[in-house]
């Protein structure tokens, strides 16, 4: 999710003068200031596009930004401001890329460490931290960083929980993120995407993964405040205990087991 792909014509109307806020100067180089109408059009357009093709990472990212303002992203920033590590993240604003994380170094870390668990998950799923879309539609620069940090931390959440990038795994993680961060885009996916599931997928989701996601998301500490770059050598199971996160059942194995019972 949130990965960059070629720009879509679906969002071309945003370039029209009535949707761009010409009275609002750019707050950072990539910033695209929008009018209220522009933000609404962006949310509706990306929302429909995401529902019909949830693999479109650009639309998922755009929907997240369009629905995070004017309230939810500020609440998430407040969570960071209340935490010493969160405040330091806001002050230092580190970015996570394959270069800054040094993936080759992570591959040589101790088995079971956060760094090793993370890079093994990346290799297994065939993804890279370099494909995260740049935030464009959040007006406040600090809040834009909060959204960027959330976006770049997403694969660490995957690695920590063990959830794969297949649709059921993404949706379970989105439900967890909604319960933990309050960002509405994750909640919308949690509610609407199951409508496209097959009966067995829907049963797994509602019986196992949604209850897991809500329980762990609400009870765990705010994951936005984890300084991942500084805990790479920490044992993954220890960090799960510190955060209050239980791993869900292995989704791919559960699918195999259910297929054998046919």
From Swiss-Prot:
Residue numbers spanned by region Disordered: 243-262
Enzyme class, broadest EC rank: lyase
Co-factor(s): Zn(2+)
Biased composition (Basic and acidic residues): 252-262
Pathway: Cofactor biosynthesis; ubiquinone biosynthesis
Compartments, record wording: Mitochondrion inner membrane
A Pfam cross-reference name: Coq4
EC identifiers of the protein: 4.1.1.130
Keyword terms: Lyase, Membrane, Metal-binding, Mitochondrion, Mitochondrion inner membrane, Ubiquinone biosynthesis, Zinc
Reaction(s) catalysed by this chain's protein: a 4-hydroxy-3-methoxy-5-(all-trans-polyprenyl)benzoate + H(+) = a 2-methoxy-6-(all-trans-polyprenyl)phenol + CO2
Topology with respect to the bilayer: Peripheral membrane protein
Domain of life: Eukaryota
Any Gene Ontology CC annotation: extrinsic component of mitochondrial inner membrane
GO terms classed as biological process: ubiquinone biosynthetic process
Major localization listed first in the record, in broad terms: mitochondrion
Residue sites binding Zn(2+) per the record: 154-155, 158, 170
HAMAP family: Coq4
Miscellaneous remark of the record: This protein may be expected to contain an N-terminal transit peptide but none has been predicted.
Function noted in UniProt: Lyase that catalyzes the C1-decarboxylation of 4-hydroxy-3-methoxy-5-(all-trans-polyprenyl)benzoic acid into 2-methoxy-6-(all-trans-polyprenyl)phenol during ubiquinone biosynthesis.
Family of the protein in this entry: Belongs to the COQ4 family.
Subunit description: Component of a multi-subunit COQ enzyme complex, composed of at least COQ3, COQ4, COQ5, COQ6, COQ7 and COQ9.
Official protein name in the record: Ubiquinone biosynthesis protein COQ4, mitochondrial
Source organism: Yarrowia lipolytica (strain CLIB 122 / E 150)
């Amino acid at each position: 999710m949130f990965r960059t792909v070629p720009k879509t014509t679906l969002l071309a109307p945003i370039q029209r003068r009535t949707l761009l806020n010409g009275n609002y100067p750019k707050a950072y180089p990539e910033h695209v200031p929008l009018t209220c109408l522009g933000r609404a059009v962006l949310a509706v357009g990306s929302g429909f596009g995401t529902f019909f093709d949830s693999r479109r990472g650009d639309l998922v990212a755009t929907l997240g930004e369009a629905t995070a303002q004017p309230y939810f992203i500020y609440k998430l920033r407040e969570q960071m401001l209340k935490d010493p590590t969160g405040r330091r993240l806001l002050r230092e604003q580190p970015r996570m890329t394959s270069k800054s994380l040094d993936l080759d170094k992570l591959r040589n870390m101790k088995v079971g460490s956060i760094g090793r668990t993370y890079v093994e998950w990346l290799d297994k799923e065939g993804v890279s931290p370099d494909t995260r879309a740049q935030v464009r539609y959040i007006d406040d620069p600090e809040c834009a960083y909060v959204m960027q940090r959330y976006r770049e931390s997403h694969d660490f959440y995957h690695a920590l929980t063990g959830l794969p990038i297949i649709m059921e795994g993404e949706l379970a993680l989105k439900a967890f993120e909604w319960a933990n961060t309050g960002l509405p885009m994750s909640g919308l996916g949690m509610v609407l995407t199951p409508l496209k599931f097959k009966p067995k997928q829907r049963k797994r989701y509602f019986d196992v993964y949604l209850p897991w996601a809500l329980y762990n998301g609400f009870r765990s500490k705010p994951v936005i405040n984890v300084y991942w770059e500084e805990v790479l050598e920490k044992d993954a199971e220890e960090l799960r205990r510190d955060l209050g996160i239980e791993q869900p059942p292995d989704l791919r194995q559960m699918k195999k087991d259910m297929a054998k019972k046919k």
